[in-house]
């Protein structure tokens, strides 16, 4: 029997509180099989666990597992992992490259924050029939949506269904039918729903969001960097490319609340959106020792 060390790191913390906890495995990750990684993620039982591996083409390679299945990308686990790597002196410089299933992605360290490069999201409006299904699965109607944000499918490596809601209280009191959300998400090959309002809990922020991902074993989580990136791309299109940063809240409307702050910074080339940098702060919550007996 051997024991695997898993750091529990809160990523996208808002000030010194909240965030979304991720499991991070560094030293013990390299010789674990995919079956072992999945079992460790199941036992850790947080939304995602990241395994930090060596890469032949980049500085590092991260693999991510929810409690029930692998997932291509994970924003908060990436932020948590690279903040910890920086704090432990393992990063050779402030910008490194992470190998992903979709190719190399840059990681930038700014003090105690880490930012991950995301490709500009492809945004596609849902058809009327699917839109009705999505709204029914949340217990809302068309007249409760933002006028210019009917549900749309977003793809930046992870696929999400983004739903703009006009009123913060409607977002707060959603009635998600997890079985229906799971079925719709699986049919559209999506990780999650990402419902948002442009009215924030804390003043001066651009949006508040909630994430539902039962297709990946996640009922609701408090910070979702890979879904926040497409929301920032949509906000950027509405701002005509004039903004340097977007501040997105998540976790405030959960019970219990776990306030999270996600920062998104557009990168432009030739006047066009070339990348969206999504990041924030992270702090260690604790350490778990997971025994494996095979």
Report the location of each language-model feature.
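Active-site proximal loop and beta-alpha junction motif in alpha/beta enzyme cores
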Residues: 1-73, 79-294
């Amino acid at each position: 029997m051997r024991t695997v060390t898993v750091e529990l790191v809160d990523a996208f913390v808002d000030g010194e509180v909240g965030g979304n906890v991720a499991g991070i495995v560094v030293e013990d990750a390299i010789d674990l099989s995919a079956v072992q990684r999945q079992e460790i993620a199941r036992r850790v039982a947080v939304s995602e666990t990241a395994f930090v591996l060596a890469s032949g083409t980049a500085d590092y390679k991260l693999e991510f597992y929810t409690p029930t299945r692998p997932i291509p990308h994970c924003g908060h686990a990436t932020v948590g992992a690279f903040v910890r790597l920086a704090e432990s002196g393992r990063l050779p410089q402030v910008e490194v490259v992470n190998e992903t299933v979709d190719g190399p992605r840059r990681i930038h360290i700014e003090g105690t924050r880490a930012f991950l490069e995301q490709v500009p999201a492809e945004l596609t409006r849902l058809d009327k029939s699917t839109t009705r299904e999505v709204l029914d699965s949340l217990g809302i109607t068309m007249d409760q949506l933002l006028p210019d944000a009917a549900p749309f499918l977003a793809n930046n490596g992870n696929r999400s269904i983004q739903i703009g809601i006009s009123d913060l209280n409607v977002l707060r009191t959603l009635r998600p039918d997890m079985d229906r959300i799971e079925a719709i998400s699986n049919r559209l090959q999506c990780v999650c729903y990402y419902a948002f309002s442009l009215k924030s809990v804390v003043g001066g922020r651009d949006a508040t969001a909630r994430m539902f991902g039962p297709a990946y074993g996640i009922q609701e989580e408090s910070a979702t960097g890979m879904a926040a990136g497409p929301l920032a791309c949509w906000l950027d299109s509405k701002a005509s490319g004039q903004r340097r940063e977007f501040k997105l809240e998540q976790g405030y409307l959960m019970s219990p609340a776990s306030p999270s702050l996600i920062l998104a910074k557009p990168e432009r080339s030739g006047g066009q959106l070339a990348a969206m940098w999504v990041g924030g702060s992270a702090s260690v919550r604790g350490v778990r020792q997971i025994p494996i007996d095979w």
